């Protein structure tokens, strides 16, 4: 899950949330999003040329869509829009499977969130180094 905070100009990595029944989760002022269906392709086994994931609100919100980007070589730490005319964008950090997600709500409000997306890669079939990566629970 991703956690977002309003009004941040820069983001620092958040620690992984622990799923303990005794740990209360505050929802007032926080937005909690679930990331699923992560997939990506590394044509040379070292860099991504496509990334895709689903993002969904978990606090009775309406957010539920697929975010994706494709290029000859997707650059780490560069923000890519989730779609045409979208207020949402993401950046990826390959070395730690880190997702940085940003939603520009207004001139004064930006939600920023981070998550680590565990995944596994297998042979892709488009060459000896081509791999396809998918999210792992």
UniProtKB/Swiss-Prot annotation:
Main location: secreted
Subunit structure of this chain's protein: Homodimer; disulfide-linked.
Disulfide bond in keyword set: yes
Note: On the 2D-gel the determined pI of this protein is: 4.0, its MW is: 17 kDa.
Organism: Stemphylium botryosum (Black stalk rot fungus)
InterPro entries: AltA1
UniProt subcellular location: Secreted
Keywords: Allergen, Disulfide bond, Secreted, Signal
Keyword Glycoprotein attached: no
AA1-like domain location: 28-137
CDD domains per UniProt: Alt_A1
Descriptive protein name: Allergen Ste b 1
Similarity comment: family membership: Belongs to the ALTA1 family.
Highest taxon, organism lineage: Eukaryota
Disulfide feature: 67-82, 121-133
GO CC annotations, alphabetized: extracellular region
Signal peptide positions on this chain: 1-18
């Amino acid at each position: 899950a991703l956690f977002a905070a309003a009004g941040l100009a820069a983001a620092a990595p958040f620690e992984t949330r622990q799923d303990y029944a005794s740990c209360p989760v505050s929802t007032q002022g926080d937005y909690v999003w679930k990331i699923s269906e992560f997939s990506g392709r590394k044509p040379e086994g070292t860099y991504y040329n496509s990334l895709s994931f689903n993002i969904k609100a978990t606090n009775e919100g309406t957010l539920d869509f697929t975010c994706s980007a494709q290029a000859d070589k997707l650059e780490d730490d560069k923000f890519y829009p989730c779609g045409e005319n979208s207020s949402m964008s993401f950046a990826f950090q390959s070395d730690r499977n880190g997702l940085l997600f940003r939603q520009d709500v207004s001139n004064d409000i930006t939600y920023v969130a981070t998550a680590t997306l565990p995944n596994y890669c297998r042979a892709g079939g488009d060459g000896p180094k081509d791999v396809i990566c998918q999210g792992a629970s």
